[in-house]
Design a protein with these regions (language model features):
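Family-specific signature for flavin-dependent thymidylate synthase
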Residues: 1-355
Length: 355
């Protein structure tokens, strides 16, 4: 077994290729195939997902396009008015007779409007798909990352219980590590089950207790049978739990013991009861480590942080507070550190935007 701590990192992209790479990462996270990512691998991977109907992954690829209303194709106008898009209008001095629109959306909206257009964008050899957009009367623009409609993605490692809460915020796009297809008994790939430390197991206490646990493990003869060895480890954790009077230490030892038992039950279900991984997962508890990719507009991120960090509508769980604080801290860094690209309120526009 392995123990990890919650961690959240914000990803974002200012060009199409970067967004396609984010979508690939989100898709591969689900089945833990990130090791297969290589230059250009997103093309084959995303087209495969489209063929299988898994188009939700395309939501993690942000799309930022702009142009005059009277030059936009009907597809671009429909994309602009999608419930999953946001837009801002402007009046340009060069053409005061036509509104100029900045559209903030994602590749799934494009796919739902025109599947062939989305596939062409995935396969484009340019950074932003300039010629493809130009044919539809729009051009790519680079948003300011502090704009309310810029899209931000969080790569979150946390407890399964926190993931279960976050997926209820459906205004966000999410991709979650699968427990159905991840075989945690396959030692060549996963080594073992990973657990994410809850808020009530303090780092310093856990480190000291786990160090003592490992010291006692080294003192016993290693059992070659995987499950019997896990039972030996559980005996050690139980003895440490029973013989310690400090409540913080007892919590740590009890937590270690529970994680060992969870791994025992999972492996017994697999190895002795002949259950496939998708059925043995029923033995996994809500403390297992789970990864998710979580994408949304800045404005929606602020709303979720208000609810899940600042308890706007009721107190959120402390484990949720940890994850949301990490997201907020990194969002603040990205929003304030991006260098001004232009003096525009929206960012940098392609030279062809007003053609």
């Amino acid at each position: 077994m392995k123990f990890v701590r919650p961690v959240s990192v914000i990803h974002t992209a200012h060009n199409l290729k970067g967004g396609l790479q984010l979508a690939e990462f989100a898709g591969r996270l689900c089945y833990k195939s990130e090791g297969k990512i290589e230059p250009g691998s997103y093309v084959k991977f995303l087209l495969m997902l489209i063929d299988k109907g898994h188009t939700s992954i395309l939501e993690h690829c942000p799309i930022y396009i702009c142009g005059y209303h009277d030059m936009m194709s009907i597809e671009m106008i429909n994309i602009r008015h999608s419930a999953f898009s946001r837009f801002v209008s402007d009046i340009k001095y060069a053409r005061p007779d036509s509104h100029f629109y900045y559209i903030y959306t994602n590749l799934r909206v494009v796919y739902n409007e025109n599947p062939e257009l989305a596939k062409a964008l995935i396969q484009t050899s340019t950074m932003e798909g300039d010629e493809i957009w130009k044919a539809h009367g729009v051009a790519w623009f680079v948003p300011k990352f502090d704009h309310p409609f810029a899209r931000m993605s969080a790569y979150i490692t946390t407890l399964r219980s926190v993931v279960d809460e976050l997926v209820r915020e459906r205004v966000q796009s999410d991709a979650v590590e699968s427990t159905r297809w991840c075989d945690y008994s396959n030692e060549g790939r996963f080594d073992s089950i990973s657990f994410c430390l809850p808020h009530w197991v303090k780092d310093s206490t856990f480190n000291a207790c786990f160090k003592r646990f490992l010291k006692d493990v080294e003192a016993i003869e290693k059992n070659e049978d995987k499950i019997q060895r896990l039972y030996d480890l559980e005996d050690i954790a139980f003895c440490l739990y029973q013989n310690d009077i400090n409540i913080a230490n007892k919590r740590a030892y009890h937590y270690i013991r529970c994680c060992i038992m969870d791994e025992i039950f999972y492996n017994e279900a697999k190895d002795e009861l002949d259950l496939p991984a998708q059925d043995a997962r029923e033995y996994l508890f809500l403390g297992i480590k789970s990864e998710m990719y979580y994408t949304g507009f800045n404005k929606e991120w602020d709303n979720i942080i208000d609810k899940r960090l600042y308890d706007k509508y009721g107190k959120a769980h402390p484990n949720m507070h940890i994850t949301m604080q990490q997201c907020k801290d990194h969002l603040d860094v990205i929003r304030t550190s991006q260098k001004a690209i232009t003096d525009s309120d929206h960012g940098g526009e392609s030279e062809s935007a007003g053609d």
